[in-house]
From Swiss-Prot:
Keywords: ATP-binding, Coenzyme A biosynthesis, Cytoplasm, Kinase, Metal-binding, Nucleotide-binding, Potassium, Transferase. It comes from Clostridium botulinum (strain Alaska E43 / Type E3). This is Type III pantothenate kinase. The gene is coaX. Substrate binds at Y100, G107, A108, D109, R110, T184. ATP binds at D6, A7, G8, N9, T10, N11, I12, V13, T132. Homodimer. Catalyzes the phosphorylation of pantothenate (Pan), the first step in CoA biosynthesis.
Length: 257
């Protein structure tokens, strides 16, 4: 049984993989001041709720974009499972060629997604990860990670409008029926959601132009808001909610088995 840990800015996603299938996955809040004891309690409770024995965990791999939680997280994993986790970072075997000016700058989440997309789809891909930040990454058919771009996430954009404009309320992220709206809440939703969809479509268009090698890139979306955006645009070919966990599983096999 392999434990997969994806620590993002907002949530930590955990998955348990055994016998070529996922048997459980959970999402807990990322909190910078949480101790290793608190993380230990949470993960042991989650395992117990699913009738999983911690002693059956034979390997662990961690991807994190939150440096200030890593000390507590690693201590928790060592204490609960008695083994050293693989940490996604410089020196790890990926099977892709990172063409960034400084490969060490590429976030662990982007590497994990790129590895998964390359190994699973075997074609040029554009990966959009709708998280706290929205990242766009391009990978060629030969496994060259070309780079991409990073944008404020959808919730960050909406929250910034609420925080900086005194008379505008915080709104739910729901797609309105029309672009031309007749009340403040729907008008904000229209501007934020349709504006974001337009951003996605334009960035995908420009990335395809720059990647042009005769093969149309396949556009994959993942992350918590992927379905919301994908339902409103033809720019996204597929939503793969498990892309990051798949990437962690692949990286574990490359580096431990």
């Amino acid at each position: 049984m392999i434990l997969l840990v994806d620590a993002g800015n907002t949530n930590i996603v955990l998955g348990v993989y055994k016998d070529k299938k996922y048997i459980a996955s959970w999402r807990i809040s990322t909190e910078g001041n949480k101790t290793s004891d608190e993380y230990s309690i949470q993960i042991m409770q989650l395992l117990n709720l699913n009738n999983l024995n911690p002693e059956d965990v034979k390997g662990i791999i961690v991807s994190s974009v939150v440096p200030n939680i890593m000390h507590s997280l690693e201590n928790m994993l060592r204490r609960c499972f008695g083994q050293e986790p693989i940490i996604v970072g410089p020196g790890i075997k990926t099977g892709i060629n990172i063409k960034y000016d400084n490969p060490k700058e590429v976030g662990a989440d982007r590497i994990v997604n790129a590895v998964a997309a390359f190994e699973i789809y075997k074609r040029p891909v554009i990966i959009i990860d709708f998280g706290t930040a929205t990242t766009f990454c391009s990978v060629t058919e030969n496994g060259d990670y070309l780079g991409g771009c990073i944008c404020p996430g959808l919730r960050i954009s909406a929250d910034a409008l609420f925080e900086k404009a005194a008379k505008l309320p915080r709104v739910e992220l729901e797609v309105p029926r029309k672009v031309i709206c007749k009340n403040t809440v729907s008008s904000i939703q229209s501007g934020v959601l349709f504006g974001y969809i337009g951003q996605v479509e334009y960035i995908v268009k420009k990335m395809k132009e720059e990647m042009n090698d005769g093969i149309e890139p396949y556009v994959i979306a993942t992350g918590g808001l992927a379905n919301l955006i994908a339902n409103e645009t033809d720019a996204i070919d597929k939503v793969d909610s498990d892309l990051t966990l798949e990437g962690l599983k692949i990286l574990y096999k490359k580096n431990r088995e």
